[in-house]
C-alpha cells in the first residue's frame, strides 16, 4: 500500500503571506471631501466699533463738539447776564485702500477637486480683517493719512495701566487706578473689552481671599468672559500684539468707521503681475493664469468730543490699555 509523505522542504523557509505592502496598489484610499482649516476670523475692530454711513467720496467730514456753553448765576435783581458760546471742531475720516492679488495657473484650477476660489475668498477676507485690526489698534503699516492707533492714543493721554509680576490683576482692572477707572476719568463709560487670548487664562485663574475662582462658579460650565457687565472678545486673527497691550477697554461707540468701498472681488484673465521692484512676475495670458483681485476702501476716527468731566482733549481718551510691566 502506497503512503503519501509530506515534503518537509516546503517549510524550510519562513511562512509567506500577502501583506498590506504587497497589495497596496489594490487597496483604495478614502479621500476627505473637505479641507480641514481653522476658524475664519474677520475684523474684531469693525465688529466692535460703530459703523457710520458709507462714504460718498474719499473724505468724510465729521463735526465734533469742542467747546461747552457755560451758565452763570445772576447777581441780584438787576445783575447783568453773561454770554457764552459753544464750538465744534472738524474731524475727517479719510478712506484708504486695502488690496491683494491671488494668481493661480488655469491648469491647477481645472485639475483641482475643490472650488479653489471658494476656499480663497474667506481667507482673503480674514487677511483684510487682520490688516485693519493691526492698523487701527497698533499702527501696524497704517496709511500716513490715518490718525494714531488706539494704543498710541491711549498712551499719549496717559491712559495706561501696567501689570507687574506681583500685581493684583483684579485691582488693575476694577480698582480706582484700574483700566475701567481710567476711561471713566475721561467722562466715558466702558462698554467693551478687547484682549489678547492669553487673558482668558489670567481671568480663569483669578481667586478671592478664600481661594475660590472669581470668574468661574464650577469647572464644568463655560466661563462667561465679561468685566463689570461689559462683554469681552479675544481677536484670534493674529493682529493683537500682547507686547503692546494685554487688553483694551473703552467706549467702543467712540471708535467709528466708514466704508467707501466694501470688499469686492474681480477675476482677471489678462494682464501682468509685477514684483515690488517693477519686474514682471506673471503674464497671465502667456503663463495661462488667472488672478483674483480683492479691494476695499475705508477710514476711521475717534471723535472724542468734549465733556464736562474732562475738558482737556490732550488727556481725554475713551480707551485705556492694560500692558505688561517692563
Predicted regions and their residues:
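Alpha-helical scaffold segments that mediate packing/assembly in large oligomeric complexes
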Residues: 89, 99-183, 321-326
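Extended oligomerization regions of viral-like shell subunits
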Residues: 156-290, 296, 326
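Protruding loop/beta-arch "assembly-hinge" segments enriched in small, turn-prone residues
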Residues: 2-26, 30-34, 51, 283-326
